[in-house]
Amino acid sequence: MARAVGIDLGTTNSVVSVLEGGEPTVIANAEGSRTTPSVVAFAKNGEVLVGEVAKRQAVTNVERTIRSVKRHMGTDWKMKVDAKDLTPQEISAFILQKLKRDAESYLGETVADAVITVPAYFDDAQRQATTEAGTIAGLNVLRIVNEPTAAALAYGLDKGEKEQTILVFDLGGGTFDVSLLEIGDGVVEVKSTSGDTHLGGDDWDQRITDHLIKTFNGQHGVDLGKDKMALQRLREAAEKAKIELSQSSQTSINLPYITASAEGPLHLDVSLTRAEFQRMTSDLIDRCKHPFQQAVKDAGIKVSDIDHVVLVGGSTRMPAVVDLVRDLTGGKEPNKGVNPDEVVAVGASLQAGVLKGEVKDVLLLDVTPLSLGIETKGGIMTKLIERNTTIPTKRSEIFTTAEDSQPSVQIQVFQGEREMAAYNKKLGMFELTGLPPAPRGLPQIEVTFDIDANGIVHVSAKDLGTGKEQSMTITGGSALPRDDIDRMVRDAEQYAEEDRNRREEAETRNKAETLVYSTERFLAENGEKIDAAVKSDVEEKLGTLRGAVAGTDTAAIREAADALAAASQAMGQAMYEQAAQDGAGAPGSGGPADDDVVDAEIVDEEDKK
């Protein structure tokens, strides 16, 4: 079944989230970031760039770079690119396609369905345009959900025992919403909403940009507003300055070579304090008050009735906004349970889960996302628990030693899909010591993997001969970053042939070494009973196999091993015939070629050194 995702299609940044094991996960994009800039650019060669790559080249490609397209949704605005008029829906679809691709890359499967959020204050035309953008992007839009409703879901406030009134104050990059919701008994009801679809962080950025243009013009008599490349650099610097002023009381904006005059290059160097910034944007803060008051009035409640305040959107990180919300709500502290940039997408993925029947009162059985196993001789990954096994689960397998009188075995635990252990994620290592001296292949060591319902891995190794046991617990055994999980699965497919060849080589070598060892032991124990000609033939082929094992030619090893196995079989047959002729029932081995030894052997790393 194709997966459903939740998407926050934002003015400045967009986020995609998915439910995994009933829990929402924000998906990192191909660049490794959890938020994707809502920027689309058209390169000169016709390539469409989306996100961070589009934002990075904006300075040198101003004419063909589009940002904040959400502000044009539901209007007849168009942008001409290479003689083609692009609508806001088409441009938004490029962003949605990027999010869809990143989600598919992360999940390793097709994403067909999506819940997309919009500001609560979006009208029908804007909502329809958003649905169309999803359709253009190849998504089946399950539902358009109001951002405040999604935010309330994400905060998990719907799990409260008593009825609660929630204020969601959502100030994003380009839109502003205030919503009051009543939540209780699993029902989320929007009581009122108000807002401004053209008020957001972009407006605060613009005030800094205007201030820089005015300051530079006063100093040098040059209007940077008429220089598109300079203006783009100013906008980027303004956004950074705004973010810095949320953390510190002053910032410096330094842009060397911003433009040039007859005298030479000119540089911009301006300091800005938080107090100045708040003074020049005070009217924007004032614009936030009326929607709040309107929402409270429409809901028919008193400010004192508000139980929780939820801040949504990156712009709510500005100290002036936090202070405003505190003042408007009578000193109530905002709930800081979820990242304001991600909360809406998280809520959207929960809503997608509700619509797909994934979120309800049912038992959710988790699975381990990657195979678990240990490294055995030849560097092979011997899997005990395959990926997608439902947990809790327990698996055991018996291994043996690789050397005579091996005093200990080292258990190296790996997680991943590659055939060779080195290419998988190493989770841990422990040693089972105190093994009594014994020939290789004789000890029986039982390795057990046990994953509990919390996904915690317990590994134990027990010598069945002595009862000696050693164990370890791996916390977060399945808690790999999802990027690693998908990379491993993709690598496993991409390098499957290469891995298979390596595994075959290791197994061929293991079998050849076992054959050499067992043949040598057989000759030592029964040499005087074997016909000289037969013995000579076996010794010759044994020498050939020893030489092949010392080299790297797998085909030569296989050929020499087959020849020795055939000669050994003939030797065993000759012995039985001789015994029958002598009428003696002397015990003898039925041939050394196939001792009951597990091929996947554990090498003691210390022994090798």
Curated annotation (Swiss-Prot):
It holds the Pfam family HSP70. The keyword Chaperone applies. It comes from the Bacteria. The modification Phosphothreonine is found at T175. PROSITE patterns: HSP70_1, HSP70_2, HSP70_3. Residues 572-609 are annotated as: Disordered. Residues 593-609 have a biased composition (Acidic residues). Keywords: ATP-binding, Chaperone, Nucleotide-binding, Phosphoprotein, Stress response. The keyword Translocase does not apply. Belongs to the heat shock protein 70 family. This is Chaperone protein DnaK. It comes from Frankia alni (strain DSM 45986 / CECT 9034 / ACN14a).
